[in-house]
UniProtKB/Swiss-Prot annotation:
Major location (coarse): secreted
GO molecular function, one term: xylan 1,4-beta-xylosidase activity
Pfam family, one: Fn3-like
Keywords: Extracellular matrix, Glycoprotein, Glycosidase, Hydrolase, Secreted, Signal
Entry protein name: Probable beta-D-xylosidase 5
Lineage, uppermost ranks: Eukaryota, Viridiplantae, Streptophyta, Embryophyta, Tracheophyta
Gene from which this protein is expressed: BXL5
């Protein structure tokens, strides 16, 4: 090749690359474009709303409808590039959605544990930090064109039924915990610390799936056809609670409606749920998006409308603003032409969408010149971020049983057998909706750091389903020659997943036989490690004498192996608490997953759901968890009488209930100061759970369905060995001490209330509150 031809070819390549980069700009309002200055939507001195309205006013109907879908086409004539709205960040930046890509520039991102495990930490500051890390990595990837700015996370559905395949994505069964997680993770993702009144967003977060969505595919009944029959009582105090907190306290910028119907109406077509509640009552400042193809689902699968145009009109009029999928893009224009929809309905939806992009800086020019513009590939998978992923896994691990053999001594283990289908897990540990992790540390790799030359490994099963017994004999032989065995069993995405609910609560296939045979062959200590999201009935294992300890490790993320090993060998003192009730198999045998009721029914024999209502005997209770230390708690100060001011003032009545709409709730707060003493020789963290037991008269006053007990506060406290720490728990009385009646109305009940401090794995203490009606809201101590 001649030098001249080489130079020409080089210039052509440079021009092509430059052209490609130009065509792939991930921002609008490029200051180098002459026309930019005349566009009102590029004028940063105007309000977001004014800029969004200006942009929408410049679009034709054909252009408008193509911006109502996740794969927005953009408006090239105005310098607005295409934008992919769908990105995921459930527990790390994920390439599950089309908005994120990994390549040689950014090969992976920090992969935290599944949400169900980080929820077990009961650590609000951890949840906030995780959100901050994820949003930093998202912004860094956006700056190099590998990620969007809108993330459809977190999942804040309550883990209603232990068989649900997507329970792993949630913070558990308790509405307060789910709400606290939602608020903190959303703030971590979205908040810009020096934003002031600008309401800028770091990235946009989305709370999903609204609402009463917690069934995917159980015995042939799928989420696309399921009609969730929910009482007003359960809707108010269980299903809606996390979403309300997410919007009102977390200030989330998006909510996603779900596939299912609620009481006969598809959630994405319900004007009461969307326009009435989210937009009207809760005052969402953001957009409402459908789960992917939800409009198509209610048209094609359940034939909810006669025509596609009717389906589109119904959704937009109900308050939907965006469609994950292409249904709105295909049929909205014709719906307007047929007068089933007004052009103003389309404009309204687009304005809500564009305001979010304005807050993200998408219309402020090159992101490299904006806040977070300095972030790049070196800010993804940083050492600090990977250390936080390890810390999150350690904080969530729950010690279920310990007969004194843990922690294992680091120097006296002569031969360690590592057994089980999840013993060498890698991808299993990062759960679903995960991206490419920075790196993996499997359980066996973590354990090898403590016993580098004395480990023997046998899987015992070909996979988690464990369909045959052929590998069990080799596992038994390995165990018989070892003095300590770590047996890692459980579930994975082939057993519990999106689109796949469990039928049973037992270990799959021959895993139970593997556990029994290993335990019977073991000379000494067996440590049983359970990797799963949903609970498993392991009652049989409690009676096997060689099983000296049991750990639940959820799906522990990229650093799971190190976390497990550090807990087993005592470099970390476990402190996690179960965020879900562990039910016996009997529950799955008797209770239909399609029954949405939370409260028990003695007539039908329905036992109720979650620790708040379940009347059966669980394998392990919500909040259960052991430590290598011994802790005690005590109340240092707390009110004993609460006077409630009502409007109008009501007469004192020892056995009455008051609608909270008549109560001056604004200043009705109480504070409890609690002390925690560590009696052990190890420093550790203690999760203090504060439960509330309503007055005995409550059932008759609110029409039944009163919780057995209810979590009203929690705090994770670090306490040095032989040291004492104190902390405060603040309660909003109207939220914490209220009950929901059968009409869905919140009531305060006067009389004697009991606070229970500690779970059933702790030494519980009690504090009594006397709630009275009065002419003022003074709290007497």
């Amino acid at each position: 090749m001649s030098i001249r031809r080489f130079v020409r070819l080089s210039l052509l390549i440079i021009a092509l690359v430059s052209s490609l980069c130009e065509s792939q700009k991930n921002f609008a309002c490029d200051i180098s474009a002459p026309a930019t200055a005349k566009y009102g939507f590029c004028n940063v001195s105007l309000s977001y709303e004014a800029r969004a309205k200006d942009l929408v006013s410049r679009l034709s109907l054909k252009e408008k409808v193509q911006q109502l879908v996740n794969k927005a086409t953009g408006v090239p004539r105005l310098g607005v590039p295409p934008y992919e709205w769908w990105s995921e960040a459930l527990h790390g930046v994920s390439d599950v959605g089309p908005g994120v890509h990994f390549n040689g520039t950014v090969p992976g991102a920090t992969s935290f544990p599944a949400t169900i495990l980080t929820a077990a930490s009961f650590n609000t500051s951890l949840w906030l930090k995780m959100g901050e890390v994820v949003s930093t990595e998202a912004r860094a990837m956006h700056n190099v064109g590998l990620a969007g700015l809108t993330y459809w996370s977190p999942n804040v559905n309550v883990f209603r039924d232990p068989r649900w395949g997507r329970g792993q994505e949630t913070p558990g069964e308790d509405p307060l915990v789910v709400s606290k997680y939602a608020v903190n993770y959303v703030k971590g993702l979205q908040d810009v610390h020096d934003a002031g009144k600008s309401r800028r967003l770091k990235v946009s977060s989305c709370c999903k799936h609204y609402t009463a969505y917690d069934l995917d595919n159980w015995k042939g009944i799928d989420r696309f056809h399921f009609d969730a029959k929910v009482t007003k009582q359960d809707l108010e105090d269980t299903y809606q609670t996390p979403f309300k907190s997410c919007v009102e306290e977390g200030d989330v910028s998006s909510v996603m409606c779900s596939y299912n119907r609620v009481n006969g109406i598809p959630t994405c077509a319900d004007p009461n749920l969307l326009r009435g509640v989210i937009r009207g009552q809760w005052r969402l400042d953001g957009y409402i998006v459908s789960d992917c193809d939800s409009i198509q689902v209610y048209f094609n699968d359940i034939h909810y409308t006669k025509t596609r145009e009717d389906a589109v009109a119904l959704a937009l009029k109900a308050g939907l603003n965006m469609n994950c999928g292409d249904f709105l893009g295909k049929y909205t224009e014709n719906a307007v032409k047929l007068k089933k929809l007004n052009g103003s309905d389309v404009d309204e939806a687009l304005i809500y969408n564009y305001i979010v992009l304005m807050r993200l800086g998408f219309f402020d020019g090159d992101p490299k010149s904006l806040p977070f513009g300095n972030l790049g590939p070196s800010d993804v998978c940083s050492k600090d971020h990977q250390m936080l992923a390890l810390e999150a896994a350690k904080q969530g691990i729950v010690l279920l049983e310990n007969r004194g053999d843990l922690p294992l001594p680091k120097t006296t283990v002569k031969k360690l057998a590592v057994i089980g289908p999840n013993a060498n897990a890698t991808k299993v540990m990062i759960s679903n909706y995960a991206g490419v992790p920075c790196k993996y540390t499997s359980p066996i790799q973590g354990l090898q750091k403590y016993v580098p030359e004395k480990i023997v490994y046998e899987p015992g099963c070909k996979d988690v389903k464990c369909g045959d017994q052929t590998l069990i004999s080799a596992a038994v032989k390995a165990v018989s020659e070892a003095d300590v065995t770590v047996l890692v069993v459980g579930l994975d995405q082939t057993v519990e997943a999106e689109g796949l609910d469990r039928v049973n609560l037992t270990l799959p296939g021959y895993q139970e036989k593997l556990v029994r045979d290993v335990a019977n062959a073991a000379k000494k200590t067996v440590v049983l490690v359970i990797m799963s999201a949903g609970p498993i009935d392991i009652s049989f294992a409690k009676n096997l004498s060689t099983i000296r300890a049991v750990l639940w490790v959820g799906y522990p993320g990229e650093a799971g192996g190190d976390a497990i090993a550090q807990v087993i060998f005592g470099d970390y003192n476990p402190s996690g608490r179960l965020p879900e009730t562990w039910y016996p198999q009997e529950f799955a045998d008797k209770v239909a997953m399609t029954d949405m009721n939370m409260r028990p029914n003695s007539t039908s024999g329905f036992p109720g759901r979650s620790y708040r209502f379940y009347t059966g005997k669980p394998i392990y209770k919500f909040g259960y968890g052991l430590s290598y230390s011994s802790f005690s708690t005590f109340v240092l100060s707390a009110p004993s009488i609460i006077h409630i001011k009502t409007n109008p003032i009501m007469n004192l009545n020892k056995t009455t209930s008051v609608d909270i709409s008549t109560v001056n709730c604004h200043d009705l707060k109480i504070r409890i100061v609690i002390g925690v003493k560590n009696h052990g020789l190890r420093s550790g963290s203690h999760v203090v759970l504060v439960f509330w037991k309503p007055p005995k008269c409550s059932k008759s006053l609110v029409g039944g369905g009163v919780p057995l007990t209810q979590l009203v506060g929690f705090e994770r406290v670090e306490v040095g060995r032989s040291m004492t720490e104190k902390f405060t728990v603040d309660f909003d009385v109207c939220k914490a001490l209220s009950l929901v009646d059968t009409h869905g109305k919140r009531k305060l009940v006067t009389g004697h209330h009991k606070l229970v401090i500690g779970s059933n794995s702790d030494q519980q203490i009690y504090h009594h509150l006397n709630v009275r009606l009065a002419g003022d809201s003074t709290v007497a101590i």
